Amino acid sequence: KKLMYDQFPKISYADAMLKYGSDKPDLRNPLVINDITEVFSREDVSFEIFKKLIKSGSKVRCISTKNTKDKPRSFFDNIDKWAKEQGASGLAYFTFEDDGELSAKGPIGKFFSKEALVEIMEKTNSEVGDSIFMACGKLNELEKITALARDKIAQDLDLIDDNIFAFCWIVDYPMFERDETTNKIGFSHNPFSMPQGDLTDKELEDPLNILAYQYDIVCNGI
């Protein structure tokens, strides 16, 4: 097997959770997660299910898949069905098309204006012929389903090269996190580490914003 990188890239914990939904990303997988919550504030987007969820604190994240316009409907429906089997409400999807004018083909395509589609293309680095899979939910559950979906879609599209080792460093872990069940704040990973920055200011800071001198090495998602 060969190394994907001569120098292992450094990825902050925050970036890893946004782009890969996990602090153990498999970088052999080229798919990236993007946050497109902002698009749903547009008046020319009428997908009301997501709009209502966003008002109650949910986010929208999506995965763009390259040149999947010729995939059969069953490819998309099977991924949506799979997401529901994981406990999610499913994955909404559409494909960018241009028959003289930009449009979106798929069950939810009609809810987006041409201008809104252009904004999504820009945010996701997508082109005509690419497809978008999107999910909406509270951050923790959203990260989980998009991370799983990223792996699932890559497997279905045969995007993973098994002959590569893709190492990376994950850095800048949060010192603390909030427990979803108790709503209390506790140590997120390793309590026996130093917080970053000037310690004299830490009492005044929101503990959830404090980063720790913690790091981890990841290879192929492990």
Model-derived features: where do they sit?
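Class II aminoacyl-tRNA synthetase catalytic cores and aaRS-like
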Residues: K1-I222
